[in-house]
């Protein structure tokens, strides 16, 4: 049996300085431009509601911004029905040609009865079993970063 993966990271260089990439990421309404699943975002201060779609599944999550360090890192926790689900974030590292953007995901469904409930809700709402969640998210993160780079490229 394969060990469960709790954290995934993917990186890609974007041809803009860190502060410009941060500004794009911190405007959470723009997430639907590059995420293959996000279809709508409603921001309210340091919180926002995101609506996602994958195949026939549509679900929402309440998100709370937990790291807002301009030019360095932006991260938020996804909470569903009061249960912690995941932390999504972006670390920004300056490079000679722009910024290395590292998107990361950490599964927060780890302990006791809350974990079991959150896992069932995750399967029901997204159709992705816990054992495949990390691989699914890695694929989505790669696409997100490619779209982010295209949106932040010279023509942006």
Enumerate the predicted regions with their spans.
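Glycine-centered tight beta-turn/hairpin loop motif at sheet-sheet or coil-to-beta transitions
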Residues: 5, 56-58, 81-83
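Short beta-edge strand/loop motif at the mouth of beta-sheet-based domains
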Residues: 9, 29-73
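Hydrophobic ligand-binding cavity/cleft-lining segments
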Residues: 1-44, 153-156
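A short, structured loop/turn motif at beta-sheet edges
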Residues: 15-19, 66-72, 91-100, 154-155
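Beta-strand/loop substructures that line and gate deep hydrophobic ligand-binding cavities in soluble
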Residues: 81-143
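Intrinsic-disorder/low-complexity, polar/charged segments enriched in Ser/Thr/Lys/Arg/Asp/Glu/Gln
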Residues: 5-11, 60, 73, 87, ...
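Short, highly charged C-terminal tails/helix-capping segments
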Residues: 43, 138-156
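Hydrophobic pocket/interface hotspot
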Residues: 21-25, 31, 48-50, 65, ...
């Amino acid at each position: 049996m394969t060990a469960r993966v709790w954290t995934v990271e993917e990186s890609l260089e974007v041809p803009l300085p860190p502060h410009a990439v941060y500004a794009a990421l911190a405007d959470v309404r723009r997430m639907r431009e590059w995420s293959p699943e996000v279809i709508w975002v409603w921001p309210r201060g340091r919180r926002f509601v995101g609506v996602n779609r994958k195949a026939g599944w549509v679900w929402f999550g309440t998100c709370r911004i937990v790291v807002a360090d301009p030019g360095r890192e932006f991260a938020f926790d996804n909470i569903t029905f009061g249960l912690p689900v995941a932390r999504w974030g972006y670390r920004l590292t300056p490079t000679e040609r722009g910024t290395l953007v590292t998107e990361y995901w950490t599964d927060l469904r780890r302990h006791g009865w809350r974990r079991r409930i959150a896992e069932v809700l995750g399967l029901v709402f997204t159709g992705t079993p816990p054992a495949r969640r990390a691989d699914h998210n890695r694929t989505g993160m790669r696409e997100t970063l490619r779209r982010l780079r295209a949106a932040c490229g010279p023509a942006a």
